[in-house]
Design a protein with these regions (language model features):
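Acidic beta-strand-loop-alpha-helix segment within the catalytic core
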Residues: 107-170
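Residue-level signal for inorganic ion chemistry
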Residues: 22, 47, 58, 92, ...
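Glycine-rich active-site/cofactor-binding loop and its immediate structural neighborhood
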Residues: 80-128
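Hydrophobic alpha-helical segments
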Residues: 12-16, 47-48, 102, 119, ...
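N-terminal subdomain of lithium-sensitive/metallo-dependent phosphomonoesterases centered on the IMPase/IPPase/PAP
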Residues: 1-89
């Protein structure tokens, strides 16, 4: 079994707590209040509640860190400390259409000399399947405890490529 860093443990714990609420809301998706942020860019009460839970849980663990939030903008923290980057419901279109492929995404961005920043840790948690994908700088990428590898294939005709593009209504 691969050991997580303390940071990843904090991230996964927060994602699982928020994910349990998303699972519940996913079962009640037809009753959610939905508004539009922009063309084909929906935000639901579930987005906002999930983000609130994540912020609360992560602030408990790292109270002086800031946040860059998809729904809530920026919450300033100590500029010499890392900050959290959060997409509380990555795949809102799928969620709102009853398609069980959506996730909670959390990253850690470390401050560097000269005002630059570097993303060093990331976690993607899929609440419906209870799967976690994570990566840490210099440790590689993982699905649960299984190391992920880059394919050696070079011919695009031999590759499997998938993408999701939400409907862009005009």
């Amino acid at each position: 079994m691969v050991s997580h860093s303390g940071l990843l443990t904090v991230m996964e714990r927060a994602a699982r707590k928020a994910g349990s609420k998303l699972r519940r809301d996913f079962g009640e998706v037809e009753h959610l209040q939905v508004s539009r942020k922009g063309p084909a860019d929906f935000v639901s009460k579930a987005d906002k509640q999930c983000e609130k839970t994540l912020v609360e849980e992560l602030q408990k663990a790292r109270p002086d860190w800031g946040f860059l939030l998809e729904e809530g903008g920026v919450i300033e923290g100590d500029p010499t400390k890392p900050r959290w980057i959060i997409d509380p419901l990555d795949g809102t279109t799928n969620f709102l259409h009853g398609i069980p492929h959506f996730a909670i995404s959390i990253a850690v961005e470390e401050p560097l000399y000269g005002g630059k920043r570097d993303i060093t840790t990331g976690l993607v948690y899929q609440p419906v399947s209870d799967e976690s994908y994570w990566a840490e700088k210099s440790r590689g990428a993982w699905r649960h405890d299984q190391r992920l590898r880059v394919s050696a294939r070079r011919d695009m005709g031999e590759c499997l490529i998938a993408t999701g593009i939400p409907f862009m209504g005009h």
